[in-house]
Every structure is written in C-alpha cells, then in structure tokens.
Amino acid sequence: MRLILLGPPGAGKGTQAGLLTKKHGIPQLSTGDMLRAAVAQQSEIGKRAKAVMDAGQLVSDEIVNQIVSERIDAPDCANGFILDGYPRTVPQAQALSQMLSGKGLKLDAVIELKVDENALVKRMESRVAETIAKGAQVRSDDNPEAFRKRLVEYREKTAPLSSYYAGTGELRIINGMAPVEEVTAEIERILVPA
C-alpha cells in the first residue's frame, strides 16, 4: 500500500496515518523526519541538506526528492508507505510520479481529508484550552493567527495537489470532519481494492 494523505493542518492526517501504520505495518514517511535522518547519517545528500539548512534556506525540491527516493528504497518500505508532508507542490508530485515509475511502483491512492476551515480553527482553540487546563506547554504556533497563516499557506501551495491528483485519477475525497473511526473506515474501504 502506497498512499498520500492530503488535507490542511489539523485535518487529522497524522492521526489517520498513525492508525494505518499500526494496522498495516507500513511506515509513515515524514519529510521532516527523513531530512533529519539524512543529516544525522551524514550521507552525501544529508550533508547537502545540512549546508542549506545551516544557511537558513529552504531545502530544494531536488534534495527533498532524492531523500524521499532513497527512503522509499529502504527495506521497511517494501510493502508500502504513507507519505506525510510530501509532496507539497505539483512539481514535487510530478517528480514523485517519475520516481515511483522508475522503481516499477505506483501510488494506490491519494486521499484528501476535506474539512471546514472555521471548524478547524475551533478545533485548534479547543486543543489549546485543553492543553492549558492540563497545565502543559502550548506550542508557539498554536494560536488562531498562526494557524490561519498555515491554512493560507496550505491553500496557496499545497491545495493545487488536489487538482493534479484528480487529473491523474488517483484522488479520493473523504469527509475529514467525521469522527476518527468513520474516517478510518472510509479510508479502509478505499484501500480494499488496492
């Protein structure tokens, strides 16, 4: 099973990916984790990524694509993977398609969790209130203004992936506002034929 979960911040992608990785025994491939691992391993591509990050710049698509390609070749990905935070742009999606094709692989599905953005903001505010009530530390970017900025960035940069994957016939849309168990069941229904 090779899967991409799409949706704005707070849509539940991480929750669903966690449930799917446990059930199917496949890894969740997070761009951030892959970058950190490549840097820690001091691989050639990791050294290039570190130099860019140390200079305070964004890591290029070329470097990210190569790191993803190498990670997909790892033995734990033999039965599939869930991509988290990649691709973020249409050029990355096109590179992923070429990369998988070159390895004789293809995506089984691209699942978009459709959510109401106002409800997401309320969900985030509730999470912050619960965190404060527990006496725990709140993340610096867990405030309505920062969250709305992340939503705008998602709409501008990542949302065009929906159109791209709709055009390839791989996109499946699920109501991300449903209870977690219902969302999981719907994802499983999509993946059964895969």
UniProtKB/Swiss-Prot annotation:
Subunit structure: Monomer.
Pathway: Purine metabolism; AMP biosynthesis via salvage pathway; AMP from ADP: step 1/1
Residue ranges the record marks as coiled coil: none
Gene3D superfamilies: P-loop containing nucleotide triphosphate hydrolases
Binding positions (AMP): T31, R36, Q57, L58, V59, G85, Y86, P87, R88, Q92, R139, R150
Biological processes per GO annotation: AMP salvage
Region (LID): 126-142
Residues that, per the record, bind ATP: G10, A11, G12, K13, G14, T15, R127, A178
Region annotation NMP: where it falls in the sequence: 30-59
InterPro entries: Adenyl_kin_sub, Adenylat/UMP-CMP_kin, Adenylat_kinase_CS, P-loop_NTPase
Cellular location(s): Cytoplasm
UniProt superkingdom: Bacteria
GO molecular function, one term: adenylate kinase activity
UniProt remark on domains: Consists of three domains, a large central CORE domain and two small peripheral domains, NMPbind and LID, which undergo movements during catalysis. The LID domain closes over the site of phosphoryl transfer upon ATP binding. Assembling and dissambling the active center during each catalytic cycle provides an effective means to prevent ATP hydrolysis.
Record HAMAP family: Adenylate_kinase_Adk
Root EC class: transferase
Keywords: ATP-binding, Cytoplasm, Kinase, Nucleotide biosynthesis, Nucleotide-binding, Transferase
UniProt keyword Cytoplasm, yes or no: yes
Cell cycle among keywords: no
Protein name as annotated: Adenylate kinase
Catalytic activity: AMP + ATP = 2 ADP
Main localization of the protein described in the UniProt heading: cytoplasm
Cystine pairs: none
Family note: Belongs to the adenylate kinase family.
Assigned GO CC terms: cytoplasm
Known EC number: 2.7.4.3
